[in-house]
Each structure stands twice: as C-alpha cells, then as structure tokens.
Amino acid sequence: MNPELAPSIEAAEREYLRSRVENLAQVSGNPFGARVFYNGDYPCFHVGASSSPMLNRIHGDLVGDPGAVLDLLKGSAQHSTVTPLVGKPSTLGPVAFIEGTRLERLKGWTHLQFVCAIDTMILSRHSFDIEDATAETFALFAEVHASGFHTKPEHRALNQASFAEQAASGRLKIYVLKAVDEVVAGASMYLASNGVAYLGTAATRKSARGLGYHAALIAHRMEQAKQHGCRWVAATALAGSQSRRNLQRAGLRVSHGQALYRLGEGWSAK
C-alpha cells in the first residue's frame, strides 16, 4: 500500500462519485431521491431509486472517528449504504468490525486502486477517432455504458442523468470513440480538486470488443489529464481484469486494495 498516495486516490474517487449523485439531486424535482451530505470533510450520499454500491456510500475517518461512520451506516441502512475499507488486498477479509459491530464484504466489490505520476505515464499510439461527447453523442455514450454494464431498462434514465453534469464545474469529462461514424465505446474522467485525474467508467459495445478501444480511451484520457494540469492519474480495476492489464501497460501501478462493506445481518438499530 502506498501510504502517501492512497488518501489522495480515495479522495478523488469520492469526489467523482459524489458529483454523479449531485447530478441526480439537481434534476428538477429530484425524482431519483438523491441526497449528498457530509461527515466532517467526507462526502456521503445515497439514492432512493438505486441500490447500487456506487451511489450509496458512507465515508469518514475510520481511525479518528469510526463511531461517526458506524452511526451513519446504521442511520442509512434502508438505502443499503456501504463504506470502503482500504489496505493491502490480503488484509481485506470477508468480515470487518467497527467498534465491535460486524461488517460484511460485498461479493464482487473488491478492487485494486492504480496510480501514476503524470510524467511517468506511457501513452500508446492509436488512430481511433476519440472526441468530447456532445449533446447528441452523450446519449449514445449512456447507451453504450448501460449495455456494457447490463443496466436494467428501468435504471437507464438514472444512469444517464448521473453522468449529465448539472453544475458548471467542468470537472466531469465524457469521451466517445467512433468507428465508421458510430459511437462504439466511451469513458469518463473526473478532474478532482486535489490534482488527481480519476479515470472513471469505460465501456465498449459487445460487438466492438478486443479491438484496442479500451486501451486507446485510457491513453486519451491520460493525455487530456496532462493538458488540464493534473499531477496524478488514478483508476480502479478488478485484479484479474483486462482493464488492469491495460492500465499497467499505460504506466499505472497498484497503490492499494479497496473493498466495500455493509452492516452484517442481524445488527440491531436499538
């Protein structure tokens, strides 16, 4: 684990996910029931219309004030909120405890966090047509993303709205890759306030996989991060995934592991 960079990587990811929930909360009438609030300096959020661990998280200082995290988990349990624990992957076991209360690790939500300095990245050359999403191509990005991640039809409007930045911060970037004038892949990037460019979601149409589009989107976003003055690039991937291999070829290295935990069965609200 990289003790110096790990907090910055986690902060960048929190900021990225918070921004997506803020986008939902700012839709007129807040139809998705999105809420963002804070535990000290740490953003927390949940979305009534979605049980996704991406959008329902409690953050906080687990060393200095673990009780605050525990209280917020209990107070928002109806939203299936989770909290991330970080460390060496081997230490992130199936069970953890906060002040004696049992937490259980979510299956399929243990990832590696990657990072590299902007001046050590390895940009691969490609000839693909990658551009910033426009009003027209943004909807196509959302379609590709929903298809790639098997988003249920009833959740597709929510998913698309979470990427549609409502504020004028300009921190959330969406890119699309075209082949023969058709959007076949896309990716997001968030320019965090701490100088870290967080490489968010990337997806490719099933019929277009294996052609190098994912690697090209990594390279493009890293190049864009440099142009925006970022000092670091960070990303998340499963340990055995092609995403991990593509990130490492681009110069990113494993910083630490992250696993998501929620309250164990049988906890009492009393």
What are these regions (language model features)?
Residues 1-75:
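N-terminal charged segments
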Residues 1-23, 57-62, 110-111, 119-161, ...:
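Short amphipathic alpha-helix that is part of the acyltransferase structural core
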Residues 28-37, 78-81, 165-175, 185:
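A short helix-loop-beta-strand connector motif used in the catalytic cores of GNAT acetyltransferases and
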Residues 36-39, 90, 96-101, 171-185:
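Conserved beta-hairpin
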Residues 61-129, 133-138, 243, 259-264:
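Acyl-donor-binding surface of acyltransferase catalytic domains
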Residues 65-73, 200, 204, 210-227, ...:
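Conserved acetyl-CoA-binding loop-helix of GNAT-fold acetyltransferases
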Residues 77-89, 225-238:
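Conserved GNAT acetyl-CoA-binding A-motif
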Residues 153-206:
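A conserved beta-strand-loop-helix scaffold within acyl/acetyltransferase catalytic domains
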